[in-house]
Amino acid sequence: MSIKSDKWIRRMAEEHNMIEPFAPNQVRATEDGRKIVSYGTSSYGYDIRCADEFKIFTNINSTIVDPKNFDEKSFVDFKGDVCIIPPNSFALARTVEYFRIPRSVLTVCLGKSTYARCGIIVNVTPFEPEWEGHVTLEFSNTTPLPAKIYANEGVAQVLFFESDEICDVSYADRGGKYQGQHGVTLPKT
């Protein structure tokens, strides 16, 4: 299993719509010159962006967090260019990009150091072979202060690994519960 380069990422995005929308190079500023947290193709990965729709965790309803029976009222929906995550809390978001992962590929996603150095952890599970959809992102604010997340800017890097052998059963074959997801998707069982 080997990591894939920028050339492979560009080719797969352009010829197979693996990433839409796609930035073939690193974008570090807006068109008017304002600096942003970078996104787009890097040497051996792709820096993904956070869309402007968020679900911010709240404990107003004083419920128990149960992944098998998650209470949707535990979140407050928010849409905007900046999301403020309360201290020691978290928020869900989704990527701007829609992914179509080839059958021979598995990805690993790691948070960008810009956020990690501020105590904001980005968690994303691997994108499995033949999974497609918007990626649901989880941001944990590990600090005792409110934390900002910027929409339409880079938040994490996706690394693509291609296997030397095709899997017997892909995510699509087994009817994965998050296949084709759009928007911020809550836990499913």
From Swiss-Prot:
Keyword Hydrolase assigned: yes
Binding site for dCTP: 112-117, 136-138, 157, 171, 181
Catalytic activity: dCTP + H2O + H(+) = dUTP + NH4(+)
Pathway in which the depicted protein is active: Pyrimidine metabolism; dUMP biosynthesis; dUMP from dCTP (dUTP route): step 1/2
Residues forming the catalytic site: 138
Subunit field text: Homotrimer.
Function (record text): Catalyzes the deamination of dCTP to dUTP.
Family affiliation: Belongs to the dCTP deaminase family.
Name of the molecule in the record: dCTP deaminase
